[in-house]
């Protein structure tokens, strides 16, 4: 029985080592000059691709948009460390203090409101650098996005039968 167990362990280790060696040989490294993956981010930020699709922006317009977006990025700040710690303290306490949580939420809502206002102002600035034809296409893209049903996340598309 001991010989059988030893043989089993030895063969398992040998096969495991062979698989590791094979896996190491077949993996490919990313090129040294490759950019890191930007998940869900278009040319101008997340969810901006649909907005600018088929607008045929000029290089000057693209540069103006980059400058506008850079200005907004400088305005958009993460919640201060104290706020994040306060939120953690509420979550990690032994008892839930509803009044404290509501006060923290109110503070966070003020910041969210300011961010939304800045975002809408930025969108307006971008819209106003477009030509009349581009504005027409922009509005068509907006309407299309409103009427399209978003795909469920993590689900496979339905098969057409």
Curated annotation (Swiss-Prot):
Chaperone among the record's keywords? yes
List where Basic and acidic residues composition bias occurs: 142-151
Signal peptide range in chain numbering: 1-23
Q: Single GO cellular component annotation?
A: outer membrane-bounded periplasmic space
Q: Which InterPro entries match?
A: Cpx_auxiliary_protein (IPR052211), LTXXQ (IPR012899)
Residue numbers spanned by region Disordered: 141-161
- What keywords sit in the KW lines? Chaperone, Periplasm, Signal, Stress response
* Pfam families recorded: LTXXQ
Localization in the cell: Periplasm
Q: How does it assemble?
A: Homodimer.
Q: Which family does it belong to?
A: Belongs to the CpxP/Spy family.
Its name, as the record gives it, is Periplasmic chaperone Spy
